[in-house]
UniProtKB/Swiss-Prot annotation:
Pfam families: UPF0231 (PF06062). Disulfide bonds: none annotated. This is UPF0231 protein Shewmr4_0656. It comes from Shewanella sp. (strain MR-4). HAMAP family: UPF0231. Belongs to the UPF0231 family. InterPro entries: UPF0231 (IPR008249).
Amino acid sequence: MEYEFRRNSLTGTYLASFSMDHEVLGQWFSEELGPELAKIQQVLDIIKDIQAGKRDSWRLIGGDLTLDLDEEQARIYANALGFEQEYELEESMSLYDAESEAYCGLEDLEEALLSWYEFVEKGR
């Protein structure tokens, strides 16, 4: 999983871009976490708790995206994917799941979060 972090010098906005099949992670980092160090640290602490066996799983529901963690992996997905549809959408109208959902290993997410934390901290 490859990623790149940038900061817009004019607006001060932090942006994360992730490799194909993980694009939604970039959106989650940029929009749901943003430059909030306390929120980033909270997720890192939860990952440590899961790795230590203190928790089995954890969920963080954001404005547009949700993070699910368990002992093996992280899943980030658009909140719209979590709802069952009462009717069938036309094929051309269906959500493009690859850009709305991604899985990665817990350790991979932890590494990316640590890098994001350092990037944001240096940019202040």
